[in-house]
A protein has these predicted regions:
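Nucleic acid-binding interface residues in structured DNA/RNA-binding domains
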Residues: 1-100
């Protein structure tokens, strides 16, 4: 069964909007919730993620693409998102699972 691309985009963005302040989820976790793969979720975020809290979606290791790190850091500090010494998000403490 083929999925409507607009519905897929809306579903991804809806999940991103549910991530609580101070927490993050991963591209893969969103993909597990909506179907598809992490790269598809990344493509949606790249094209349509501006209006949602995009900084709450990170790689599975807690890192962001280098081009987003500087923009995300103020949000993490404001929201009290747990960070590791490396600057990546502490996924043990900050991960939010959209399937729970």
């Amino acid at each position: 069964m083929r999925r409507d691309p607009e519905d897929y985009v809306e579903h991804v963005l809806s999940i991103v909007e549910q991530v609580p302040r101070g927490q993050v989820t991963s591209y893969g976790a969103i993909a597990a919730a909506v179907g598809g793969g992490p790269r598809q979720v990344g493509a949606v975020m790249s094209r349509h993620g501006g209006p949602v809290p995009w900084w709450r979606v990170v790689r599975a290791d807690g890192s962001l693409p280098p081009s987003h790190e500087d923009g995300a850091r103020p949000h993490y500090l404001e929201e009290g998102t747990p960070l590791r010494a490396s600057g990546a998000v502490d996924m043990v403490r900050a991960f939010w699972d959209p399937l729970e």
